[in-house]
Amino acid sequence: MNYLILGAGPAGLTVATKLKQRGEDSFLVLEKEREAGGLCRSAMVDGYPLDIGGGHFLDVRRPKVNEFLFRFMPKEEWNIYIRNSQIKLNDLFVHHPLEANIWELPENLQKEYLVSISNAGCNLNTPMPDTFVEWIRWKLGDRITDDYMLPYNQKIFSDTLNELGTYWLDKLPNVSYEETLESCKKHKAYGTQPGHAQFYYPKKTGYGELWKGMADYLGNKIIYNVNVKRINFVEKNVNSLDGDCFHADVIINTIPWKEFDEFIGMPEELVDKISKLKHSSIETRYFPHDLDTEAQWIYYPDSTLPYHRILVRSNFCMGSRGCWTETRKERVCMFSEKINPEFRFESEYAYPLNTVGKQEIIKELLNWCEKHQVYGLGRWGEHQHYNSDVVVERGLKLVDEL
């Protein structure tokens, strides 16, 4: 066999689909679950689709990616939305990102935030710190840091935030005192919009239906319920938990590296580094009541609440009702035992954590693997917090390179 693809999430499906479109027939996809889609799967809950891996949408910003995907769910089957995401600060709701929407706060709070921003290290030209917590404080000022950024990131990623690096925060813009002041005077947001400022969501189904369409196109090229646990870099094969062996000239891995129990032929020091990769696990749980809001998702930095985010399904899934919460696994115990959700699902691998030293580990790992014709791809193959549209783009690029 020419190509073996591990995982039938967006990354694996994209590579397999592109190979087939190019006339390649000697390939196979191995999937642990009984259906394709990975974190982007959907389930019917209370009569409408719910995205079990959390909030996943199709960004409008990559037309070539969307053109590729619309072959499996035509453009006319999607609605397009302008993102409405909000943050709940105590009893107030402010649009996300907070630093661009200080003007929505009461005037007394605007003044406090403005003073804090003026004293941020990046605005005083003080040296850039090395630790995550102090870097955030240097970049955004004390108020945004303490009221939102630190408590929210603790809820979604880790209680010990300084295990995170700062190398992935460069995309955060400096918070300008002058621009924030002008924003407050004009009652208008400033700066660039976050990802998914505009997004597509299916009119009649969940996001998972897109990936099912790709899986249907691949047909028997996907084998389900195969839990790969061993990879042999010498013999170019993998073994499943059931003992089945699959061989290929090129192996494309899109599953978490920590899912492997054994790495034959890999240096022990590199195997040890893989064990240092970290991730967070997220539970989604559905509640049938509607929220009185136009927001599609709401961020909750309040540390007394277990969940960090609510997705308001009725505001992007036509005709539906209800909402779902997203909660880091370690905080699920904070829910009252009296609260019995109609549906819950836990994603063990939800977010790869950008820990100190991670980028060096991944660079060394991927470079070594490529020398043995094994390629890491996607959120888990590259251990990067990629959204599905980015994953598809990278999958298409990899096929071109191969």
Map each language-model feature to its residues.
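Active-site/ligand-binding neighborhood in enzyme catalytic cores
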Residues: 92, 110-234, 244-247, 254
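Mid-domain catalytic core of redox enzymes
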Residues: 22, 227-343, 364-368
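Conserved flavin/dinucleotide-binding core of flavoenzymes
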Residues: 42, 97-98, 312-402
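Glycine-rich FAD pyrophosphate-binding loop
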Residues: 20-45
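Conserved Rossmann-like nucleotide-cofactor binding loop
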Residues: 11, 35, 258
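N-terminal Rossmann-like FAD-binding beta1-loop-alpha1 element of flavoenzymes
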Residues: 2-29
